[in-house]
């Protein structure tokens, strides 16, 4: 109950919140692409990825993270068919032993049975995997998002991210034994 009806109401803040709530995921992605890549490149990417993301992806991934995924997908080529990002989710604290790995691939999916032994041999326990098929019409990409535990406690991600990604890539490309 409000005493004497003296509560201050910020009408501009309420309007701003309503406008933000009414914006679609695609609208937010378009804005994030323009902010990250500039208007011309943002428009090109918006047109390419406009209908590409499946519903599960748009429900699971915020538009700002989708921009990072698009950047990884755009870096793929015939010579560079695998991209990756080893990271800790924002909702996990630095002292968490949970880590994630996103694999990005062109044309065909990566099979769980190919990746699981590699991750386990690198000392991680896979507790979940979510695949996303990104269909841009003229080309198809795959994103596999792995959720994992490091059984010996938290990883110092800043120190281990680059080494992990290099080791995984070398194993994937048969330059190191699994």
Where are each of the predicted segments found?
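Non-catalytic interaction/regulatory segments
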Residues: 1-178
């Amino acid at each position: 109950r409000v005493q004497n009806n003296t509560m201050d109401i910020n009408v501009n803040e309420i309007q701003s919140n309503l406008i933000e709530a009414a914006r679609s995921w695609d609208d937010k992605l378009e804005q994030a692409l323009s902010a990250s890549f500039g208007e011309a490149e943002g428009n090109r990417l918006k047109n390419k990825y406009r209908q590409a993301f499946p519903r599960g992806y748009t429900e699971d991934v915020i538009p700002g993270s989708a921009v990072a995924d698009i950047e990884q997908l755009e870096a793929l080529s015939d010579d560079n068919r695998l991209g990756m990002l080893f990271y800790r989710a924002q909702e996990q604290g630095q002292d968490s032993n949970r880590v994630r790995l996103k694999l990005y691939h062109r044309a065909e999916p990566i099979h769980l049975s190919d990746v699981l032994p590699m991750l386990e041999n690198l000392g991680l326990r896979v507790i979940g995997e979510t695949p996303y098929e990104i269909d841009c019409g003229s080309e198809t990409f795959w994103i596999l998002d792995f959720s994992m535990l490091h059984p010996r406690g938290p990883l110092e991600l800043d120190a281990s991210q680059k080494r992990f990604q290099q080791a995984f890539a070398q194993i994937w490309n048969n330059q190191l034994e699994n």
